Amino acid sequence: MSIERIKYPRTFHLPYSQSRTDDDKTLPDDSQFEGMNVVVTIKMDGENTTVYPDGYIHARSLDGHGYAWQNWLKSYVWKFCGSLMEGERLIGENLYAKHSIGYKFDSIEDSFQVFALICDGFFENWSDIEDFCLWNGLKHVEVIYKGIYDKDKIIQAFENKKKELAEQGQDIEGFVVRDENEFPTSEFQKHVAKFVRANHVQTDKHWRETWTKNEF
């Protein structure tokens, strides 16, 4: 039976996000998150990648075109893709290639960082992601805040992390807010949004033409 390949939804900017491109979409306000239990994670500067139970992977585009920086991941996914149920897919950031921000990882395996599990039209809750990563020896994107949505607390958590990384000579792109609980894919924009820091350089064309590896 063939498996349907599905593009990951577009993430809208929070209204207080500091950096946008011309084709980005922005929420009119953040009222949808009021009273919501959320998980806030670091927004990593990599390639959005979807993994299926049969080991097939694709980036945001569904054209199936492969690139050299995806080759290691195509082999690595066989370590865990068998743990995905029928109708389930795993989404993570492929950080093998350096984009605008360079990273240094303890191992090459850490350059794939999970941020979503989707099954039969629903984004699974955050604890399911943590469990899947624990059982399969995977790394998920770092959590900087968890609790009732509070803009001020979230921004403070981000600034604290930004300062911590700066002291280590590292940069940070921004953060992603998501509902801690399960929600339907059809309502993605009601449950997920992003913040990108000021002056984050968008260099997709450049990094592909002269790409280099991150450090492992």
Where are these regions (language model features)?
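Core nucleotide-handling region used for phosphoryl-transfer chemistry
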Residues: 1-216
